[in-house]
């Protein structure tokens, strides 16, 4: 009887964990389109944070930088180094794009762990990091695809498409497929890591006291920063590859 009771309690515990909801959305109707309202809300918050930081950074620049100015200059220098390393000498026009990608993803990832989104109640679903939604990560990956197609066409014209039959026309289907797998791998890698991190924290909080998940939360902050760097680095690498024509 005790064994049966223990089994029932275990099943109840598993049922409680399975009650953690993934994928519920708060929808807005805009014209004939249905959009994810919670993603727009959190994205606007992230954009507001970035715009406010940019305004502070350029408000009163000093010849001898202050601590705050040193921080912003370090961030800019870091983004420039990533762009130059991956793209090459023609990196300057792409610094704003790579920087925007990196900062948006970085702040989005960290907002999921640091901002108390659950305080805001929605009719359906709940607020979370923008990158916790597959639509956001796919949109970022598609922007990257447009960017490296634009870079290749701008540099080489229609000759850019000759890469699809190199080194032999037999590889044409594989080379075309590669351009579809690049954005897919970018989007699913980012989405999967951020979603998994939030799910692990939620499950641990439901199973053990609050103190135990804290190391996991710090690990999540670290991996969130790494994911932003990986996305920006790969985006820059794809752009550099399309301009140079090498694999």
Swiss-Prot record:
One of its GO terms (molecular function) is proton-transporting ATP synthase activity, rotational mechanism. F-type ATPases have 2 components, CF(1) - the catalytic core - and CF(0) - the membrane proton channel. CF(1) has five subunits: alpha(3), beta(3), gamma(1), delta(1), epsilon(1). CF(0) has four main subunits: a, b, b' and c. Key component of the proton channel; it plays a direct role in the translocation of protons across the membrane. Pfam families: ATP-synt_A. Belongs to the ATPase A chain family. The keyword Nucleotide-binding does not apply. Gene3D superfamilies: ATP synthase, F0 complex, subunit A. Keywords: ATP synthesis, CF(0), Chloroplast, Hydrogen ion transport, Ion transport, Membrane, Plastid, Thylakoid, Transmembrane, Transmembrane helix, Transport. CDD domains: ATP-synt_Fo_a_6. It is a multi-pass membrane protein. One of its GO terms (cellular component) is plasma membrane. It is found in: Plastid, Chloroplast thylakoid membrane. The chain crosses the membrane at residues 38-58, 95-115, 134-154, 199-219, 220-240. HAMAP family: ATP_synth_a_bact. This is ATP synthase subunit a, chloroplastic. The lineage of its organism: Eukaryota, Viridiplantae, Streptophyta, Embryophyta, Tracheophyta. InterPro entries: ATP_syn_F0_a_bact/chloroplast, ATP_synth_F0_asu, ATP_synth_F0_asu_AS, F0_ATP_A_sf.
């Amino acid at each position: 009887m005790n064994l049966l009771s223990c089994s029932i309690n275990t099943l109840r515990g598993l049922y409680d964990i399975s009650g953690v909801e993934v994928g519920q959305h708060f929808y807005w109707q805009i014209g004939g389109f249905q959009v994810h309202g919670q993603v727009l809300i959190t994205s606007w918050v992230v954009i507001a944070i970035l715009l406010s930081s940019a305004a502070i950074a350029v408000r009163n620049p000093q010849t001898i930088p202050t601590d705050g100015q040193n921080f912003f200059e370090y961030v800019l220098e870091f983004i420039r180094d990533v762009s130059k390393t991956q793209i090459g000498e023609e990196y300057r026009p792409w610094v704003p794009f790579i920087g925007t990608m990196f900062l948006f993803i970085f702040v989005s990832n960290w907002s999921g762990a640091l901002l108390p989104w659950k305080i805001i109640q929605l009719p359906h679903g709940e607020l979370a990091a923008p990158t916790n939604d597959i639509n956001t990560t796919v949109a970022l990956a598609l922007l990257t695809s447009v960017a490296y197609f634009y870079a290749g066409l701008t540099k080489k014209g229609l000759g850019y498409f000759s890469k699809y039959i190199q080194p032999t026309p037999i590889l044409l289907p594989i080379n075309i497929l590669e351009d579809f797998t690049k954005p897919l791998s970018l989007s699913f890698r980012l989405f999967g890591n951020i979603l998994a991190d939030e799910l692990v924290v939620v499950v641990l909080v439901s199973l053990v006291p609050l103190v135990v998940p804290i190391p996991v939360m710090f690990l999540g902050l670290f991996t969130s920063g790494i994911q932003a760097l990986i996305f920006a680095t790969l985006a820059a690498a794809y752009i550099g590859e399309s301009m140079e024509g090498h694999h």
